[in-house]
Amino acid sequence: VPGQTAGVSVFTDDLISTTGLTRLQLAIAYLVGTGTSGLLLGAGGRAIDRHGSRVVAFAATVGLAATLLGLSVIGPMSTPVGLVVMSIGFGCLRFSGQGLLTLASRNMVAQWFDRRRGLVTAVSSAVASFALAASPALLLVLIDIDGFRTAWQIMALALVVVVGSIIITFYRVSPEAAGIEIDGRGRTAIPDEPEPGTSAPERTVLIIGTEHDATRAQALRDVRFWALTIPVAALSSTATAITFHIVDLGAELGLTDDEIVRIFVPIAFVSVPITLLTGWITDRVTPLFVAMAMTLAQLVMYPTIGLLDTRWGAVAAVITWGAAQGCFSALTSAAIPKVFGRRYLGAISGAQMSAMVIGSAIGPAFFALVQSITGGYRAALWLSMLLPAIALLLSIAGLRHDQHGDRRAHACR
């Protein structure tokens, strides 16, 4: 939560008043920091392939806790110094939290399941959705108790003690590394560590996936990768921007802070059953259908966010945001290993996560820029519809690609 936008947005006004930066300047720092972290996530994905999710997730947890402690002691700064400090702070926060810890956790789950991967990742994401939905209101309560500094310090302690313990206790690299086959179908000859006293030729080389799995370069040249990635990158960008400016957006619409942050809870209630449904669907058909559904939901969601002050607008925005969010898990956790395999899962998922994080970096700054020009956020919401429209066309192209491949495979038989 601390590295996600929902965990940052409630601290925005405190950061503005403490550092002396304007809202646009803080958004620019968020853009620079988050964009930089997105560029580094490709290396993070390769590190997961090399060292495993357990090591990377624990390192990310410690890094996130250290970042929160550092941010908790900031004070008034000149504009140039403030921009540099907050860019570094946001970069570390987003790289360790939203980026590396999330990527390592998703990959760990995806490595362990095949037959019901979509459903398992959906259940995991449903729990995370409720946590993220509840976090803004809970963090506001924590801030009200003793200020934003203490809130961040408490979260840093909880990360090391609670999350760190969970990672050490439960995270494992892959079924192959644990000496079993995926889905628990049987045993293999591959142990966690080589047996003492065995010679080099006797040691089995750990192989994950199959020789048919796509490399990162092959995936990036495949239209299906972009059909699966652009919808989640678009939602990351726009949803991050909305969440980052949620208090200011509420003021524009005549809503109080408490009224505007309450929309996240019904969004979670909508997204959870759809998350489970799309996970079930992904286990049975191509995830490109889920990508198409996500783009259609976004095309309705974005303009209706600007109508949250009306009853029908609020209902439409909550339903479509929940629907789009409900497709997220299927495309980020289950779709990549299903389409491209597990051998280079870290590298390919890292590329997808990079696009998402870079999108989430651009969104808040873009919305702040449009707001400074037009005096409101509605124009930014309408302009944000361009990416989902492009993604819809790519999804259709991806379906044609799959159909062509099926016909070719049938002809070979």
Task: Indicate where each model-derived feature is located.
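C-terminal transmembrane helical hairpin of 12-TM major facilitator-type secondary transporters
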Residues: A239, L255, E259, F264-A335
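Symmetry-related core transmembrane helices of the 12-TM Major Facilitator Superfamily/SLC fold
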Residues: W152-T169, A380-A397
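C-terminal ends and interior cores of transmembrane alpha-helices
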Residues: V62-T79, A297-D309
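Intracellular juxtamembrane helix-capping segments at the cytosolic ends
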Residues: G97-F113, C327-F340
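Helix-to-loop junctions at the C-terminal end of transmembrane segments
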Residues: L40-S53, I274-T286
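Extracytoplasmic gate region of multi-pass secondary transporters
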Residues: Q4, V8-T12, A217-T275
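Hydrophobic core of transmembrane alpha-helices in multi-pass small-molecule transporters
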Residues: V81-L100, A233, G313-C327
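Interfacial helix-cap and linker-helix signal at transmembrane-aqueous boundaries
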Residues: L15-I16, A47-I48, L138-D146, G250-A251, ...
